[in-house]
């Protein structure tokens, strides 16, 4: 064994949250030694309250457990098929929550901690890594989450570039393309400008009359806002990331001269009438199934967002893949910085997992930890593991992180933002269902349900094939 191979034989994982804990379990399950580094309880974050591994800082819900109709439920099912520790401990500590999987947070964390503590191949090191991991660690997973300590975050930023990490991220709502009413909206770029990769008709535009605009501004000003957490109050807003309601507070016309300016656009449905304001939506993924509302980062509560944004002409029936938000977060510009196996292009011995990579949510973080663990174990054993198909929830989420987004057409801030798993990340069905088993035609919501069920069935079938064709041979090598 060469010195390089020896340095890869032990996997060092920094951070024992959901992603790091799951990664450690997956690595050890492949017969590879793990050192799991966790700074708590010696150094706490502003959000954590215990030294337990995989502590749930906010909600105790893992969201829907419906693997036939819901994207996160599908992700649950895929992770269970891959022996996920997080899912096993969640199932063992479930509390009643209707169709959702919610857990006793203390029991869940205790179960994860006990499982990792008792595994013969896992060593838990309760110490802070206050900079880049030592150079002689040849196989590292960094899974330090959105509250990464300042010294480590600074070291990562120095290794990449100044804009690689966002400490106060702006999240705009994302809408499913097929829920937008195109009898009111239209495709057009301002002045028909075709940017890199664009056609000159790259935005969906929703026009507002003067009365509609002022009613919208009033609703923003009156809408209920989310309070900042204590640990979120120090960082300033980044330029260009002001919440839309803050812009509205600065003057009734501010939005008309900002993200809602109507210039360079003509409504083909009513070309003689110039819109007073225009809301633009920009394609958010390569598949063209998701569009984000440009400039609409917000701290409005979710109920207020859906109510207010559905007053926009063309968005009355909008279905949201993600609602907006603005909060302290640490995440990489992963499509630029990471390769398809989650390795840092600038230093491939470092692999990233969890919320730092640009996934959002407990289950998504654990899922990327699972994949990171499988990749690190394969590296330790000098094997190559192919990525899961993008038709699976795991593959779709990985695709979003490592390249499934598209760059913004205009110059300005990068477009990559954290996201939950949702059906908009999956490739379309080659042959969408149109009829019921009895031969009658599917209509309305029936068609939507059948489509989701077909996507879920395809995903589980393709995952089983990937396990048999790629994962098992790699593990046996």
Curated annotation (Swiss-Prot):
Its cofactor is FAD. FAD binds at residues 15-20. It is an enzyme of class 2 (transferase). One of its GO terms (biological process) is tRNA wobble uridine modification. Keywords: Cytoplasm, FAD, Flavoprotein, Methyltransferase, NAD, NADP, Transferase, tRNA processing. The keyword tRNA processing applies. Its main location: cytoplasm. It is found in: Cytoplasm. It catalyses: uridine(54) in tRNA + (6R)-5,10-methylene-5,6,7,8-tetrahydrofolate + NADH + H(+) = 5-methyluridine(54) in tRNA + (6S)-5,6,7,8-tetrahydrofolate + NAD(+); uridine(54) in tRNA + (6R)-5,10-methylene-5,6,7,8-tetrahydrofolate + NADPH + H(+) = 5-methyluridine(54) in tRNA + (6S)-5,6,7,8-tetrahydrofolate + NADP(+). The keyword Cytoplasm applies. GO terms for molecular function: flavin adenine dinucleotide binding; tRNA (uracil(54)-C5)-methyltransferase activity, 5,10-methylenetetrahydrofolate-dependent. Disulfide bonds: none annotated. Its EC number is 2.1.1.74. Pfam families: GIDA. GO terms for cellular component: cytosol. HAMAP family: TrmFO (MF_01037). Belongs to the MnmG family. TrmFO subfamily. PANTHER family: GLUCOSE INHIBITED DIVISION PROTEIN A, METHYLENETETRAHYDROFOLATE--TRNA-(URACIL-5-)-METHYLTRANSFERASE TRMFO. This is Methylenetetrahydrofolate--tRNA-(uracil-5-)-methyltransferase TrmFO. The gene is trmFO.
């Amino acid at each position: 064994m060469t010195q390089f191979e020896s340095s890869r034989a032990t996997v060092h994982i920094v951070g024992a949250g959901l992603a790091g804990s799951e990664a450690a379990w997956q690595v050890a399950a492949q017969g590879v030694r793990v050192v799991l580094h966790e700074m708590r309880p010696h150094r706490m974050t502003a959000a954590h309250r215990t030294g337990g591994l995989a502590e749930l800082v906010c909600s105790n819900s893992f969201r829907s457990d419906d693997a036939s109709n819901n994207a996160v439920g599908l992700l649950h099912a895929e992770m269970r098929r891959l022996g996920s520790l997080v899912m096993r401990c969640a199932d063992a500590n479930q509390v009643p929550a209707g169709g959702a999987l919610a857990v006793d947070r203390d029991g869940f964390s205790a179960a994860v901690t006990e499982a990792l503590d008792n595994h013969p191949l896992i060593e838990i090191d309760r110490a802070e890594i206050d900079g880049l991991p030592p150079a002689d660690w040849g196989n590292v997973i960094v899974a330090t989450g959105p509250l990464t300590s300042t010294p480590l975050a600074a070291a990562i930023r120095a290794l990449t570039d100044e804009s690689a990490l966002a400490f106060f991220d702006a999240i705009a709502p994302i809408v499913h393309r097929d829920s937008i009413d195109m009898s009111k909206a239209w495709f057009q770029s301002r002045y028909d400008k075709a940017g890199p990769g664009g056609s000159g008709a790259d935005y969906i535009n929703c026009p507002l009359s003067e009365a509609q605009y002022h009613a919208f501004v009033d609703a923003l000003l009156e809408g209920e806002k989310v309070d900042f957490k204590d640990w979120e109050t120090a960082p300033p807003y980044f330029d260009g990331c002001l919440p839309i309601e803050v812009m509205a507070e600065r003057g009734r016309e501010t939005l008309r001269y900002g993200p809602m300016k109507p210039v360079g656009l003509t409504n083909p449905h009513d070309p003689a009438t110039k819109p007073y304001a225009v809301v633009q939506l920009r394609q958010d993924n390569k598949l063209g199934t998701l569009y984000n509302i440009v400039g609409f980062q917000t701290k409005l509560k979710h109920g207020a967002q859906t109510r207010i944004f559905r007053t926009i002409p063309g968005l009355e029936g909008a279905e949201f893949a993600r609602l907006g938000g603005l909060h302290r977060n640490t995440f990489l510009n992963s499509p630029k910085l990471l390769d398809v196996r989650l390795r840092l292009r600038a230093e491939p011995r470092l692999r990233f997992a969890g919320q730092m990579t640009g996934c959002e949510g407990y289950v998504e973080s654990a899922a990327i930890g699972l994949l990171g663990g499988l990749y690190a174990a394969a590296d330790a054993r000098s094997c190559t593991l192919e990525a899961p198909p993008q038709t699976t929830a795991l593959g779709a989420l990985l695709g979003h992180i490592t390249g499934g987004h598209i760059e913004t057409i205009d110059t300005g801030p990068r477009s990559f933002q954290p996201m939950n798993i949702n059906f908009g990340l999956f490739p379309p069905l080659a042959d969408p269902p149109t009829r019921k088993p009895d031969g009658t035609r599917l209509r309305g919501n029936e068609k939507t349900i059948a489509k989701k069920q077909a996507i879920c069935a395809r995903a589980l079938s393709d995952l089983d094939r990937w396990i048999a064709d790629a994962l098992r041979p790699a593990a046996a090598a």
